[in-house]
Swiss-Prot record:
Protein source organism: Candida albicans (strain SC5314 / ATCC MYA-2876) (Yeast)
GO BP annotation list: adhesion of symbiont to host cell; cell wall organization; polysaccharide catabolic process; septum digestion after cytokinesis
Catalytic reactions of this protein: Hydrolysis of (1->3)-beta-D-glucosidic linkages in (1->3)-beta-D-glucans
Coiled-coil region(s): none
The EC number(s) this enzyme carries: 3.2.1.39
UniProt-annotated stretches for the region alpha/beta subdomain: 668-762
Region described as Disordered: 73-113, 325-345, 378-421
Record protein name field: Glucan endo-1,3-beta-D-glucosidase 1
Lineage of the species this protein comes from: Eukaryota, Fungi, Dikarya, Ascomycota, Saccharomycotina
Residues listed as glycosylation sites in the UniProt record: N235, N263, N286, N290, N308, N328, N338, N362, N386, N423, N502, N775
């Protein structure tokens, strides 16, 4: 009876809708929706609300009921990762008078994501509108059931506007998305050509592999340092107790706040309209009852006039009462303890408002500065602190406004925002600077010839972009805007070739590996021209290519018969994520489509769902792969058609100025043609990246596609990568098509009918300079014994002439690593050991070392390249582009510069806490490195936008101007760059840069764990390579478990360690505990005992991310040997990192 009631209710609803129009009929198609018996009635009521039971319409309805199945047997009808099967031949036939039925497709197995589709079709005569709900279930989660909403009355022409709503998450990880309305209609198929016999020979793709050369220099080195004798060192005997470091203790002074007090130090800032001289005396009574009362007397004499003001009493907020813990050679340090006592501040009013606000932040000295039209500097004298009790201390200091401009006690405002980093809201892509780079970078050109026809209209040219191969050599290497691969075909057939990627075509192999029986690589065959955009006038001797409009995510290829033909040309826009490959024929070109494989069948498909000026063809190649070909005419033209000349040539019947030809691999399910139909005629011409952040943590970014042409949906079709799907938001949530296309090395891409893809991410603000792992639950704490060992290691490692050491290194990569190593030692001395005297000595040494580079006196000075627009190495000016790791030709810039920027951030941070302005004084030089590798805005015309980081791919491409496929060998050094600009932005007050670095880290956390780091449950990469645990070199079209400097057969530590170094607080944001532990267990544990070099320390510090106890024991061993350290790694930092992680876990 229950089943009968549901059936009757269904019939009632159909009749009610049918009566709205004499010609309108409703067809509801539900694909493989599994529901249990108890919910059947509720399900029907949701579909047909407000309809009484028992009413009969007489219209036959078929309801297919599937009994409840075990969870592991429930399968979905469509998949975001379909297997590669032959295309269905049956065309969709929807007619108003047909009997609707529930269609159950053959289940498709999937590893990554499943999709179930429930669709409702509204038909009027020949034209139907399909509304669809799609449920995406990531990572093989259990499916959920989705339902249609009440249908709006539709006219025969589909309403194509999108419906804005957020994703609907469920408890099992599914997200329900709604597609844009699209039209479908009766499709009539007519055969244009069908082969009755096959050619005697057919094209077979090459599966030969090109081995990676492993002759590059090892990036881990143990070059000797220039030693020196230090007169100042940490007195370990004065370390008497443990230390705990709070977040407040590492907060930088903010120039918009005027008073600073932490760790027993005071920085007092007064505000005036003019320069002033200041004298401040302070006294904290030993008899203070609550430990938080502070008396200050301040007399300020203005230059032009005198204004007296007395600060009579400040009672410090008791949540920041110093809790003194230990002494060392130069100061009494403190940490902050909580108290419930209240605070108050009493100020005597004066004619000038001298204090705007009070805050208590971390400082290591007493400083006095004045905000005015010009900033006056102040010099801090040494402070004497006598530890009397936990709540009282005597302190006196004298401050003078006379200061050396280079003194570490200078204090000046940096940054332009009134907001602190923690609550910054605004643009993520503000220009860093729009002025020319400093003149210290000599103007010159790298000795690389740009081919004729490459012209970016005076704008900087991206050197690490997907289109770079079109600028190099013979210009015939493939490019991968994704999901398709393309190349300039200059032999046999002449034009621009297109190929798709098929899982079944991947080539796996194993060579020079430590994992016997496991594939060490896979790749996709190249230069397989399934279709070639050409024209009858193109030939070997009469074809010219131009490359122009090169931007962050796009470029334009133009083919013509000669370089001076400005009237007859073929434009092919290349845009990352483009759903069609599009050719626009201009002038008197007769279109020609070639195929290396050959065409077996060509059919014309007509439908009222297509625009009247659009022709749709389906071409089946001799390899049984089907392609959709859409021809859009400027006006409806009944005379134009595609004709088959032979197996390998499809020719347009005549030239048409403005003709558009678009091709796409046909969907696995022919029913999904409707989305390509809805997008046909519109194509993407470019894309930009924009984004914003709210309150410092909630970030969003989006790809906005520019379009040309017209489609029935008023939208183009674009594709997103797997790492995009989990963070997708905005209007794209309503634009899912269910179409998937296989990428080269990044799994399945998903199609959307939209001109905008928007994503949301959360920025982690807790991770900054000091040690952090995701397992740390407590405060950063160090025992007395650990501090003594840290101090001993620091004393030994700081006995070096840092400037002399880095000056003579024959690579900016190595010198940058060494500079960063000493910066981290400085950080430990300043923040953990807290020895002020040694901190100042090390800080001055670091400043001297930086002068080598800011004055451009290193082994390979830097220059500004006026040809491509960038700050790059002069190492190739003598003819060797491979010197300095190829840096001159823009290889590894983020790796190299990340070390300098990170070191500068630490130096600036420590110096700023001491009241100095080193960061401000050197900001232009450091920012030039940031701008070169990561310029965020086209407003900065001296550098290309985002040279290294590919916002679409979710990671950087290291390879610069070398004829090969884009690749990245060290994911961790790319991460280090993002962390560096985040910290540098924090130090100089550039909140946009700081947040942008944080966003890059969040994006990499997604992409790295899908494409580079392989847990056993990874569902994006092929299962054949997962036991390797790491990608090795990740190319655009290949994953190769090796390195450029050695193979895992001999040195497995190379391929694993290059994705670890350097270990910093940001490492654990990306290298998740579960992954690191699995990699160690399955791989590293098997060879770690055989590693006896600088790689040992890298692997062991990585161990701290999941096993800090063993890591610390290694670095604290009595049998310690410095040979286990790379030049870029110190024992001091390694001990601090491992101990901090151990004690707080």
């Amino acid at each position: 009876m229950l089943f009968k009631s549901v059936l009757l209710s269904t019939l009632i609803a159909v009749q009610a809708l049918a009566e709205n129009s004499a010609h309108q009929e409703i067809v509801t198609v539900t694909k493989t929706t599994h529901i249990s018996n108890p919910c059947l009635e509720n399900y029907a009521k949701k579909l047909l609300p407000n309809n009484p039971t028992g009413l009969t319409t007489g219209i036959p309805i078929v309801i297919v009921y599937a009994p409840q199945q075990p969870d592991n047997q429930v399968k979905q009808s469509e998949s975001l990762q379909p297997t590669q099967s032959s295309k269905a031949q049956q065309q969709q036939q929807i007619q108003g008078s047909s009997v609707p039925a529930s269609i159950h497709d053959t289940p498709t197995p999937t590893d990554h994501t499943k999709i179930t589709v429930t669709s409702t079709t509204i038909c009027n005569q020949k034209v139907c509108t399909v509304k669809t709900f799609s449920t995406i279930i990531s990572h093989s989660e259990s499916p959920t059931t989705t339902t249609t909403t009440k249908q709006n009355e539709e006219k025969s022409i589909a309403d194509t506007k999108s419906f804005t709503h957020k994703a609907l998450p469920s408890s099992n990880g599914a997200v329900t998305l709604k597609t844009t309305s699209v039209k479908t209609a009766l499709t009539t198929t007519s055969t244009v050509f069908s082969a009755t016999s096959l050619p005697s020979t057919t094209y077979t793709p090459s599966t030969s592999v090109s081995l990676v050369s492993t002759t590059k220099k090892n990036p881990v080195s143990s070059q000797s340092v220039v030693s020196t004798t230090k007169t100042i060192s940490i007195n370990t005997s004065l370390i008497t107790d443990a230390v705990t470091i709070t977040k407040e203790a590492t907060t930088l002074p903010n120039s918009k706040h005027s008073s600073i007090f932490t760790n027993g130090s005071i920085s007092f800032i007064s505000t005036s309209a003019n320069k002033v001289k200041s004298t401040v005396t302070s006294d904290i009574s030993n008899n203070s009852q609550n430990g938080s009362s502070l008396s200050l007397t301040s007399t300020i004499n203005q230059l032009a006039s005198i204004t007296n003001s007395t600060l009579t009493t400040i009672t410090k907020p008791t949540s920041l009462v110093p809790d003194f813990s230990y002494t060392n050679s130069s100061r009494v340090s403190s940490t902050m303890r909580n108290s419930s006592e209240e605070s108050s501040m009493v100020l005597e009013k004066s004619s000038s408002k001298l204090l705007s606000s009070t805050s208590f932040l971390n400082s290591s000295s007493i400083a006095s500065t004045t905000e005015s039209s010009e900033l006056a500097s102040a010099t801090t004298s040494d402070s004497s602190l006598n530890h009397s009790s936990s709540s009282s201390v005597e302190l006196s200091s004298s401050l003078s406004s006379e200061a050396d401009s280079s003194s570490s006690s200078e204090s000046v405002e940096t940054g332009s925002s009134d907001e602190t980093a923690s609550n910054y809201s605004g643009d993520l892509f503000k220009a860093i600077d729009t002025n020319a780079p400093p003149t210290v970078f000599a103007r010159s050109e790298i000795p690389l010839t740009i081919p004729a026809g490459v012209d970016n209209n005076g704008k900087p040219i991206g050197t690490n972009k997907f289109y770079t191969n079109l600028l190099l050599g013979n210009q015939d290497f493939m490019v991968y805007p994704l999901p398709y691969g393309l190349y300039w075909s200059k032999t046999s057939y002449y034009g621009f070739a297109v190929q798709h990627n098929n899982v079944s075509d991947r080539v796996f192999g194993s060579i020079n590996t430590n994992n016997k029986g496991v594939a060490s690589y896979y790749f996709n065959p190249t230069n397989n021209a399934e279709l070639i955009f050409s024209a009858t006038s193109f030939s070997k001797d009469s074809m010219h290519m131009k490359v122009s409009q090169m931007a962050e995510l796009s470029a334009l290829v133009t083919l013509s018969s000669s370089s001076n033909d400005e009237s007859n040309y073929l434009d092919i826009p290349l845009v990352q994520g483009m759903g069609f490959v599009t050719g626009i024929y201009n002038g008197n070109l007769t279109p020609l489509l070639n195929s290396l494989f050959g065409v077996k069948d060509l059919s014309l498909e007509t439908s009222d769902a297509l625009l009247s000026n659009v022709l749709k063809y389906r071409a089946t190649l001799l390899n049984n792969v089907q392609w959709l070909i859409y021809v859009t005419l400027p006006d409806k033209d009944t005379d134009f058609k595609l004709e088959v000349e032979d197996f390998y040539n499809l020719k347009g019947s005549k030239p048409v100025d403005g003709l558009i030809i678009q091709v796409a691999i046909a969907p696995e399910d022919n029913d999904n043609d409707k989305y390509y139909d809805a997008a046909a005629g519109m194509y993407v011409t470019g894309a930009t990246v924009s984004g914003s952040v709210s309150q410092g943590t909630a970030a969003s970014y989006k790809f906005s596609y520019t379009t040309a042409g017209k489609s029935s949906s008023n939208n183009p079709i674009v594709f997103a990568l797997p790492h995009h799907m989990d963070s997708l938001t905005g209007s794209a949530l309503d634009a899912l098509t269910g179409i998937t296309v296989t990428s080269t090395t990044k799994g399945e891409m998903t199609g959307f009918l939209t001109n905008e893809l928007e994503f949301s991410e959360t920025i982690n603000q807790d991770v900054e300079f000091l040690p952090w792992t995701e397992n740390m639950t407590g405060s950063l704490t160090y025992t007395k014994d650990q501090l003594e060992l840290l101090a001993s290691a620091a004393n030994k490692e700081l006995a070096a002439n840092i400037a002399a050491t880095v000056k003579n290194m024959n690579s900016n990569y190595f010198s940058g690593k060494v500079l960063d190593k000493y910066a981290q030692i400085l950080l430990v001395v300043s923040e953990i050991i807290q020895d002020e005297e040694v901190t100042k000595d090390a800080l001055n040494a670091m400043k001297d070392a930086f002068k080598v580079f800011t004055q451009n006196k290193q082994y390979y000075p830097l220059m500004y390249d006026t040809k491509f627009g960038g700050v790059t190495s002069t190492s190739a000016q003598d003819g060797d582009p491979n010197a300095d790791f190829g840096s001159a030709y823009y290889n590894d810039h983020d790796f190299h510069y990340g070390y300098f920027i990170h070191a500068a951030a630490i130096v600036g941070y420590v110096d700023k806490k001491l009241g100095g302005t080193w960061a401000q004084s050197n900001k232009d030089w450091v920012n030039s490195l940031v701008r070169d590798a990561s310029n965020p805005s086209a407003d900065d015309t001296y550098f290309p936008v985002s040279r290294m980081f590919d916002w679409f791919s979710g990671h950087s491409w290291a390879t610069g101007l070398f004829v090969t496929y884009k690749n990245i060998e060290s994911s961790s050094e790319s991460l280090h760059f993002a962390a560096a600009i985040k910290l540098w932005g924090k130090v100089v007050g550039d909140q946009s840069m700081e947040a942008r670095g944080g966003l890059m880290i969040s994006i990499m956390a997604r992409s790295f764990n899908m494409y580079f780091y392989y847990k056993s449950d990874n569902t994006v990469e092929p299962k054949q390579i997962l036991p390797n645990k790491v990608s090795g070199i990740f190319f655009e079209n290949k994953v190769d478990y090796t390195t450029f400097f050695g193979t895992p057969a001999d040195h497995p530590e190379y391929v694993h360690g290059i994705h670890m170094l350097p270990i910093t607080p940001s490492s654990s944001l990306v290298r998740k505990t579960s992954y690191v532990q699995e990699e160690w267990k399955d791989q590293i544990a098997g060879f770690i005992d055989n590693v006896d070099s600088g790689w040992t320390g890298i692997l062991r510090l990585n161990q701290a991310l999941f096993d800090p106890k063993s890591s610390y024991e290694f670095f604290a061993s009595n049998n310690w040997d410095d040979k286990w350290l790379d030049n870029g790694q110190s024992r001091t930092w390694s001990l601090a990192f491992a101990a901090g992680a151990l004690n707080a876990s």
